[in-house]
Amino acid sequence: MKTIVIKRDGCKVSFDQTRISDAIKRAAEACQITDDDYCEFVAQSVSQSLAGRSNVDIREIQDAVENQLMAGEHKDIARAYIEYRHDRDVAREQRGRLTQEIRGLIEQSDVSILHENANKDSKVIPTQRDLLAGIVAKHYAKLHILPRDVVLAHERGEIHYHDLDYSPFFPMFNCMLIDLNGMLTNGFKMGNAEIEQPKSISTATAVTAQIIAQVASHIYGGTTINRIDEVLAPFVKASYDKHYKVAQEWQIADKEAYANARTEKECYDAFQSLEYEVNTLHTANGQTPFVTFGFGLGTSKEARLIQRSILENRMAGLGKNRKTAVFPKLVFAIKDGLNHKFGDPNYDIKQLALECASKRMYPDILNYDQVVKVTGSFKTPMGCRSFLGVYEENGEMLHEGRNNLGVISLNLPRIAIEAKGDEAAFWSLLDKRLELAKKALMTRIARLENVKVRVAPILYMEGACGVRLKADDSVAEIFKHGRASISLGYIGVHETINALFGTQKHVFDDETLRAKAIAIIQRLREATDQWKAETGYGFSLYSTPSENLCDRFCRLDAAEFGIIPGVTDKGYYTNSFHLDVEKKVNPYDKLDFEAPYPPLANGGFICYGEYPNLQHNLKALEDVWDYSYTRVPYYGTNTPIDECYDCGYTGEFSCTSKGFTCPRCGNHNPARVSVIRRVCGYLGSPDSRPFNAGKQEEVKRRVKHLANGQLG
């Protein structure tokens, strides 16, 4: 029987006795002993001890050599062999990727690690600790958890296994809608404290901040509170009742006016504290909690007050320089008959939201009717863009407490490059990659199958996931039957079309190319629908934000296939289905171009436009919002809101490959400027936490979406 040796990297080679004898002879030479017969005898003895074995690990062979040498007459050779093996192991480890990445973090020299996430400040110790844990977790998962073909596909850039620094090493999931109402209403335990139902809005928001921090430390994606205005409205009423009681006790003449004034002040202060709390917290993941607040549908006096408080606080800014807050991400719901048009009861709140968006870029908007049409029911996205599908429990629609288990993204441009212009080859390759992506996604599900509730009490025992399970229960059941989603992502539709059909025609300008692009996403959707039917899990199609991936996929493809005009030449791939950032079109045409995609990729999407300063032209901004209402479910507006604290300039800083600079005075000191950019679905501060090279280049190339050079 031929013996196969399994090497450290998993490769398999035929057993060769001469390699053993050569190593022993080198050890003998090192201690100046000449006895070739002895060396051959030891090698032969080791070979005989392994006879009949089909497979043997390289370490087992080396251990056998050491044992034979230690039992033999030349102890010096044994010592020399052991020292030689140790030195080789050390040298090998120093050359290994794990050690190289750890060194790159410690020495702050590996920008791919330092700038991978724009929400993580890699200069500070807590973040460095998280990044170190992530390096180790990623290394272990690749070697010991994931199938080899999945790992190789990830390494080559055929697919991307998102968040490998957390999952599958840890039994964590991606993003979620917190069941805040259930937690505040029924109480819960956090650490050593039993938390009862709050008796005021200030207490409710303080507790909410602690819930956000705890939840964000147990998951790796975004944390969303759906309809926060409606959830917290009862606690505003509780505050009003307390203030009214004080007015009665002190015999204040206009008790109602007093109670209203005190309640408005308390509500504003409560949400100011919540905003500061979110932006000063550091989770166990080494970052500010990536949290989203959905609001806008509440009609009560209390809910309206919360809506105003959220928007007014955001406009006020943070600190003495009134800096734009990056978190929470604000998502404002617009509904016809409620706040959409003049005369609607909450139209005044929409006007406040428009003002806020012009000054602070947030809120993004959710168009109620389109969200229901595309996703089956109304809900705020989890994180920046992940949407849940329809799920009923006890005959009622359920949103809160649900989550996404994770994402695997396809590199569509690479498939197109490999197809070499052959559409049939493209579709064949795509189907093969889809099978691989499904296999990778199933590993995420498998990792959670035998996990006990006790690993994350805040999620599974105290109500964040909408359940109150026991410590030794399994978590797997709450992810089945579509209660949780699990997503196939994709990137670079624009570059895919260019790779397949050339750059003579732009996809925006050619109806045939548009149809071909849509057909690709239609095929992805068919695959996820099929997987859902086969497994019972909530597979969905997700338009990947690609903050880091836009750089990584393009970099790998350029190294493999060279610089291809219109594909790998820019240094980044375009975000999901979005229009090429360099294409000069008006915002209405851009909306129409992107509108077909959210209904297909209804597990995750966002559309947005680039605009000039609109603070003095809110009507123009409202026109775009209104145009989007019947066309896309989810829309964001990017406007220039940069500030220089040296010369007082406000507007748009100059963007170069090296960073951002004040166009008036040249200031680029992160401590003396505020630069805010949409990273993908959320905002970032690239002045203090730089983007990766690909994302920086993409931001640099963005053009304004204007009608005939102007808007409005």
Where are the regions that the model predicts?
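Short, hydrophobic beta-strand segments
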Residues: 3, 46-50, 291-292, 495-500, ...
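Long insertion/accessory domains within large nucleic-acid-processing enzymes
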Residues: 666-712
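Conserved catalytic cores of very large enzyme subunits
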Residues: 91, 98-482, 503, 510-669, ...
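Conformational switch/transducer regions in large eukaryotic molecular machines and scaffolds
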Residues: 16, 656, 681-682
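Charged, amphipathic alpha-helical regulatory modules used
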Residues: 1-108, 696-703
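Contiguous, well-ordered alpha-helical segments that form the cores/surfaces of helical PPI scaffolds
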Residues: 230, 486-499, 522, 678
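Metallocofactor- and cofactor-centric catalytic cores in central/energy metabolism, strongly enriched
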Residues: 28, 271, 275, 499, ...
